[in-house]
Amino acid sequence: MTEFRSGFVCLVGRPNTGKSTLTNALVGTKVAITSMRPQTTRHTIRGIVHRDDFQIILVDTPGLHRPRTLLGKRLNDLVRDTYAEVDVIGLCIPADEAIGPGDRWIVEQIRATAPKTTLVAIVTKIDKVPKDRVAAQLVAVSELVGDSAEIVPVSAVTGAQVDIVIDVLAAALPPGPAYYPDGELTDEPEEVLMAELIREAALEGVRDELPHSLAVVIDEVNPREDRDDLIDVHALLYVERDSQKGIIIGKGGARLREVGTAARAQIEKLLGTKVYLDLRVKVAKNWQSDPKQLGRLGF
């Protein structure tokens, strides 16, 4: 009988390299926020992959980057702390972008912080380029990480090679117990997941500066007194400037209604029940650089 393996895998890379989409594909359901805007993941989301002979706990970190705000520095510290605590690091590099200084800097950070941790290089977004481009990127990644790291191409969107990535990561794990019961897919509290789903809906189609300036806090979750099949969710969306508040709300409140409709559909899937979603937008000036406000908003 094969020995059961289990452990923690950290997916790292520059912002917007497909880490959250890959986490969701590996787990088989949505546990991490995805957005075309960089730097949208702010919590270490753990997704859990269950099989008969192994269990992978996936840690989806913010993209490592050179920070410009106190929030950025705290996100980087979170990533480095995670490096030191996991069994395998999965370095995500997209097939459709040339390797640059940012990728080299991250490899240096990994080597400095966790020199003995197993490194697997994952070439993401292979559905976006022809096969010859994928092959060229595999060679370039091999030169970047060296012979000791295994390299796997994958498309989280189409599902191509997702099972191979799972097998490679599982093979690198040590023997160990199942940390989570079968069927549990994430250890994030439901309120955190709800806040992330609202944030994802609010980020769709907005200007580049907004992702960094938007935080969502779930204020209250209550079952409706006169209805067993309805839950009331009240959430606050914090931005840094009045102009950003206008972007979120839109003309006559149209955009906020769209955000509410999209987020409510996702939250109803998460909770398995009907939801009344109340969204309010508030300005918390320069919260990204204010330690007290960062703490209040969960950072």
From Swiss-Prot:
Residues 60-63 are annotated as: G3. Exhibits GTPase activity. Binds RNA but is probably not involved in ribosome assembly in mycobacteria. Residues 39-43 are annotated as: G2. Residues 13-20 are annotated as: G1. Residues 5-175 form the Era-type G domain. It is found in: Cell envelope; Secreted, Cell wall. It comes from the Bacteria. It comes from Mycobacterium avium (strain 104). Residues 124-127 are annotated as: G4. Monomer. Residues 154-156 are annotated as: G5. One of its GO terms (molecular function) is rRNA binding. The gene is era. GO terms for cellular component: cell envelope; cytosol; extracellular region. Belongs to the TRAFAC class TrmE-Era-EngA-EngB-Septin-like GTPase superfamily. Era GTPase family. Residues 206-285 form the KH type-2 domain. This is GTPase Era. The lineage of its organism: Bacteria, Bacillati, Actinomycetota, Actinomycetes, Mycobacteriales. GTP binds at residues 13-20, 60-64, 124-127. Its main location: other. GO terms for biological process: ribosomal small subunit assembly. Pfam families: KH_2 (PF07650), MMR_HSR1 (PF01926).
